[in-house]
UniProtKB/Swiss-Prot annotation:
Keywords from the named record: Cytoplasm, DNA-binding, Transcription, Transcription regulation
Major subcellular location class: cytoplasm
Entries under HAMAP family matching the protein: Transcrip_reg_TACO1 (MF_00693)
Protein name as annotated: Probable transcriptional regulatory protein Ent638_2432
Keyword flag Transferase: no
Family recorded in the similarity comment: Belongs to the TACO1 family.
Top-level lineage group: Bacteria
Originating species: Enterobacter sp. (strain 638)
UniProt-recorded Gene Ontology molecular function terms: DNA binding
Record's keyword annotation contains DNA-binding: yes
GO cellular component: cytosol
Subcellular location: Cytoplasm
PANTHER family in the cross-refs: TRANSCRIPTIONAL REGULATORY PROTEIN YEBC-RELATED, TRANSLATIONAL ACTIVATOR OF CYTOCHROME C OXIDASE 1
Length: 246
């Protein structure tokens, strides 16, 4: 598929901020520990751990830090009470939002998440209220490249779809459990991805205008500032014209 705006991404990421780097590392370490505790320390047989390792490396975490986190999870530690919680809700402009958390205190987490929705004109929904609009997928991203070559190699490696954006970027979609294998197969063909992650891909989009777009971005920022929030997914789409006004 072609003609998509990169603003259609399900997750908005601002330029890296040094002030948030420590918090990002803390969240990644928490996910590494939990993934290893639940599924074991072998990334080859633990897709969740493999995805966490990919994210850690993409954020320039050292192998030493990464391996220590995995060892903590395998050995058991005080993170044993952590559980994955998914909150669903509606953001500005009717945007469907899913918030993935790792928490040892549901009451604290839901209060922080609800506050973010309320402050930006949204509302926290019930389980299942928006989940049906999303599918869990692996996303392998190239900032640029030969579309035909990547598409041919990706489909041969077992990818489900390839999307080209207006700015020349290319995303390869896979079953989430197969993301690592497809990425490695592409690398073996000389096609090194710029990023690979597990994401929730929406089946429909909600167009944001000049009024709702900044509110949506504020909601995402508020949620990501919560210590317990690991990922924020949404179906908001901001056109290039609206983006230019932000």
């Amino acid at each position: 598929m072609a003609g998509h705006s990169k603003w259609a991404n399900t997750k908005h990421r601002k330029a890296a901020q040094d002030a948030k780097r420590g918090k990002i590392f803390t969240k990644i370490i928490r996910e590494l520990v939990t993934a290893a505790r639940l599924g074991g320390g072998d990334a080859g047989s633990n897709p969740r751990l493999r995805a966490a390792i990919d994210k850690a490396l993409a954020n320039n975490m050292t192998r030493d830090t990464l391996n220590r986190a995995i060892a903590r999870g395998v050995g058991g530690d005080d993170d044993a009470n952590m559980e994955t919680i998914i909150y669903e809700g509606y953001g500005p402009g009717g945007t469907a939002v899913m918030v993935e958390c790792l928490s040892d205190n549901r009451n604290r987490t839901v209060a922080e998440v609800r506050h973010a929705f309320t402050k930006t004109g949204g509302n926290l929904g019930t389980d299942g209220s928006v989940a049906y609009l999303f599918s869990k997928k692996g996303v392998i991203s190239f900032d640029a490249g030969d579309e035909d070559a990547i598409m041919e190699a990706a489909l041969e490696a077992g990818a489900e779809d390839v999307v080209t954006f207006d700015d020349g970027a290319i995303d390869v979609y896979t079953a989430w459990e197969e993301m690592g294998a497809v990425r490695d197969a592409l690398a073996a063909m000389g096609l090194k991805a710029d990023n690979a992650e597990v994401s929730m891909i929406p089946s429909t989009k909600a167009d944001m205008d000049a009024e709702t777009a900044p509110k949506l971005l504020r909601l995402i920022d508020m949620l990501e500032d919560c210590d317990d929030v690991q990922e924020v997914y949404h179906n908001g789409e901001i056109s290039d014209e609206v983006a230019a006004t932000l």
